[in-house]
């Protein structure tokens, strides 16, 4: 049925992509039937997520996505945040909001640059994983005020 490496067989890849998407679709329908919004923290960039973990999240019907754009995990600088956000926003094409999920220790030394990369490439907002200190939260508030961005 499969070649010696099923993970490289396109029919197996499609099976995995479809299986995960079907589960997400069932959950999404149940949540939305109850009048609630639904979101998920997903792997970064739709193309990377498809390849790495078989998440075809660009085709899901969620209200918001929080791609985990942990640039340090992939040995990338803050510019990678912008590229990942841009791909994500383009893929969802206005159907949902994209909030860049940032690993705080990865961006601590390039805090404002990382935020610029997210917002300048279309992120509706950001979420912090392994959260910032109060000092950085104050810097974040000042950044939002300076850029004329509202807080929700």
How would you label these PLM feature ranges?
Residues 2-62, 68-75:
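Polysaccharide-binding and catalytic clefts of secreted carbohydrate-active enzymes
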Residues 61-152:
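Substrate-binding cleft of secreted/luminal carbohydrate-active enzymes
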């Amino acid at each position: 049925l499969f070649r010696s490496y099923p993970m490289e067989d396109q029919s197996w890849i499609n099976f995995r992509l479809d299986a995960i998407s079907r589960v997400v679709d069932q959950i999404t329908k149940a949540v939305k039937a109850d009048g609630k919004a639904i979101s998920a923290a997903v792997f970064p960039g739709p193309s990377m997520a498809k390849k790495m973990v078989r998440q075809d999240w660009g085709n899901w019907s969620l209200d918001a996505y929080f791609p985990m754009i942990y640039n340090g995990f992939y040995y990338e600088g803050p510019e990678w945040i912008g590229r990942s956000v841009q791909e994500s926003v383009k893929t969802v094409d206005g159907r949902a909001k994209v909030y860049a999920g940032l690993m705080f220790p990865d961006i601590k030394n390039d805090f404002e640059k990382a935020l610029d990369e997210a917002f300048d490439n279309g992120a509706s907002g950001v979420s912090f994983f392994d959260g910032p200190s109060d000092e950085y939260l104050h810097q974040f508030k000042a950044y939002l005020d300076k850029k004329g961005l509202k807080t929700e």
